Each structure stands twice: as C-alpha cells, then as structure tokens.
UniProtKB/Swiss-Prot annotation:
Similarity annotation: Belongs to the uracil-DNA glycosylase (UDG) superfamily. TDG/mug family.
GO molecular function, one term: uracil DNA N-glycosylase activity
Keyword Cytoplasm among record annotations: yes
Subunit composition and interactions: Binds DNA as a monomer.
Species the sequence originates in: Escherichia fergusonii (strain ATCC 35469 / DSM 13698 / CCUG 18766 / IAM 14443 / JCM 21226 / LMG 7866 / NBRC 102419 / NCTC 12128 / CDC 0568-73)
The protein, known as: G/U mismatch-specific DNA glycosylase
Length: 168
C-alpha cells in the first residue's frame, strides 16, 4: 500500500493516477526506477536535491505532498477503469478541501478528464479550482510516457514559478 503524504498548508500536492506494482511492493510513491518524478521535481525547483522514493516523507519539508486518484495498483495506468477514476476524483476533492494546498497538480490529462468529467484539457493551470486551490494538469512522469525529460521539467517548473510569483 502506498500512503498519501499530505499535511495542511502545502504549496502543492502532486496527484498520480495509481500506484504501479513496484510502488505498491516497496510502499513508496513513484518507486519504479524508470519513473522520472523525483528527477523532474528536483530539476523543476521543488526540492534542493533529488530525493529517493524511500525519502518521500521528506517532501513535506519542501511543502509538497503526494496522493493518487486510485488506490489499486496495476502494471500500467491504462488498466484503471473510468469508473475508478471518477470515484477517485470525488475522493480527491474531499482530500483537497480538507488540506487546502495552494495547488493540486494532476499528473496526466486523461486522469484529469475522467476523474473530473472534463473535456479538451490543455496542459498547465486550469480554470476551475477546488476552493482556493488551483488545479494544474501536468504530463505524467512515468517511464512509459513519451514526453521528454526536458518537456516534463519545463511543465513542472511553470507551476513552481507560478507559486514563487505568488510568494509561496
């Protein structure tokens, strides 16, 4: 089981789709060696060094958190059903209302669209919010994603810089 890493007052909560088998086995988010999450958030400016998956709790020191739309682990995220994503979206809204981070970064367009009943989503900041929490849709850092490391870092850095500009 991969536990959420959440606390009140965070700058951002990164929301993955669901745990991969490697993450579920190890008990840490984004634990597969091919997953680029830890490298990307470091290079984008969220952390001052590249954390290891087993150091995930240290994200709180950087005012960052991690959650997921669906708890069920799978080999690939495309094994998660639309129904699971939609139910996960409802649960995610409750978590965000409870913790009220400045931003929620959903990692993947399809996850966002199915979890929140949206269509035609563009990358970046979205027009709707959860209370005062901005919603951002960022490319998924999975090793299966065809998005280059450079593009991932650029997208995540845009969120980090937006928070910095707001004094966060």
């Amino acid at each position: 089981m991969v536990e959420d890493i959440l606390a009140p007052g965070l700058r951002v909560v990164f929301c993955g789709i669901n745990p991969g088998l490697s993450s579920a086995e190890k008990g840490f988010p984004f634990a597969h060696p091919a997953n680029r999450f830890w490298k990307v958030i470091h290079q984008a400016g969220f952390t001052d060094r590249q954390l290891k998956p087993q150091e995930a709790q240290l994200l709180l020191d950087y005012r960052c958190g991690v959650t997921k739309l669906v708890d069920r682990p799978t080999v690939q995220a495309n094994e998660v059903t639309k129904l699971e994503l939609h139910a996960g979206g409802r649960k995610l809204i409750e978590k965000i209302e409870d913790y009220q981070p400045q931003a929620l970064a959903i990692l993947g367009k399809q996850a966002y669209e199915q979890g929140f009943s949206q269509r035609g989503t563009q990358w970046g900041k979205q027009t709707h919010t959860i209370g005062a929490t901005q919603i951002w849709v960022l490319p998924n850092p999975s090793g299966l994603s065809r998005v280059s490391l450079e593009k991932l870092v650029e997208a995540y850095r845009e969120l980090d810089q937006s928070l910095v500009m707001r004094g966060l």
